[in-house]
């Protein structure tokens, strides 16, 4: 009952069947199930992608509250970088199973290096419609880019910010 209360569910929710829950309630049940084991790490793979924006915010706020209360770490896997920015201290950008760029949330958002990272960030809608209308979105086509993920090494950008690429790509992207 304590765990259910912690995630915002009433004790009677323990007697319900999965089809009787809303999407947000299902996520809360999933979080409660994970918390019962008192984990040091929770892997949350696309845990909010199927929820509407207001419910996403509620679930992410709940996760942040639990993290502050328990010290639990999250590996938060998502395509929605605006939510990733809100919940994460550090970000790793993966594409086709390759870790392309890592750094603090600030480093990645303020100075993205890899073209794939830049394309993901340019897909985040801006709240100012005038700025949004003028912005040119970056697209990324791995095949057309000529980038071979199997080549290259980890290049230090600054602080804890690294990007995996060849020396030539690093020089070109950091101009």
List each language-model region with its residue ranges.
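A short, proline-enriched helix->beta-strand linker immediately N-terminal to the Walker B motif
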Residues: 36-40
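Short catalytic/signature loops enriched in Gly
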Residues: 105-175
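A short, surface-exposed alpha-helical micro-motif characterized by mixed small hydrophobic
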Residues: 84-86
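Hydrophobic anchor residue at the start of the ABC signature
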Residues: 31, 43, 59
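Conserved ABC ATPase signature
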Residues: 17-21, 25
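Conserved ABC ATPase "signature" region
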Residues: 1-12, 121
């Amino acid at each position: 009952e304590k765990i259910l209360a912690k995630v915002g569910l009433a004790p009677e929710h323990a007697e319900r069947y999965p089809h009787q829950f809303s999407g947000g309630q299902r996520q809360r049940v999933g979080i409660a199930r994970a918390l019962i084991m008192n984990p040091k790490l929770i892997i949350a793979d696309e845990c909010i992608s199927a929820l509407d924006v207001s419910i996403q915010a509620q679930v992410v706020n709940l996760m942040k509250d639990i993290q502050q209360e328990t010290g639990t770490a999250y590996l938060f896997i998502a395509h929605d970088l605006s939510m990733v920015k809100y919940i994460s201290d550090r970000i790793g950008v993966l594409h086709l199973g390759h870790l392309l760029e890592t750094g603090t949330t600030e480093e990645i958002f303020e100075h993205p290096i890899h073209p794939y990272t830049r394309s993901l960030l340019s897909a985040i809608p801006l709240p100012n419609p005038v700025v949004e209308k003028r912005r040119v979105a970056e697209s990324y086509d791995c095949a057309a880019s000529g980038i071979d993920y199997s080549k290259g090494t980890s290049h230090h950008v600054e602080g804890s910010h690294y990007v995996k690429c060849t020396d030539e790509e690093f020089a070109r992207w950091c101009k």
